[in-house]
Amino acid sequence: MTTNFPRVPAKLLEKLRDYPDHIERLQEVLNIVAATPPSLIPRLERAIEALQGRLGTFMAEARRELNQARSSGDPRLIAAAQAKASLMSQIRLKHVWMTDKVFSVYFSGV
């Protein structure tokens, strides 16, 4: 049996294009939600919570990287880590990516 898993919301794909491992990690949590049997909590809500949780993890990781970069004193590392932390902070807000119709329809219709 082939299962068509949902795709990561387009806005997240766009914003994370330089972080393919992050996209893969988001896809993993969506696949888990899609494969999990129905429960009292709607799948769309579970998918949103799963993405928000993983995005929160990305933010925490980016903060750690920023702290490490600051400790190194290397201006290039600091600038790169600040840019990454800023991006992760931005995408953590669901209004940035929740307008993806394909995502919403997939989880509403499953």
Question: Residue locations for each model-derived region?
Answer:
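Solenoid-repeat scaffolds in large eukaryotic assemblies
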Residues: L77-A81
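Long, non-catalytic architectural segments outside compact domain cores
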Residues: M1-T57, E61, A83-V110
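Hydrophobic/aromatic side-chain positions at a characteristic register within alpha-helices
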Residues: L66, R70-G73
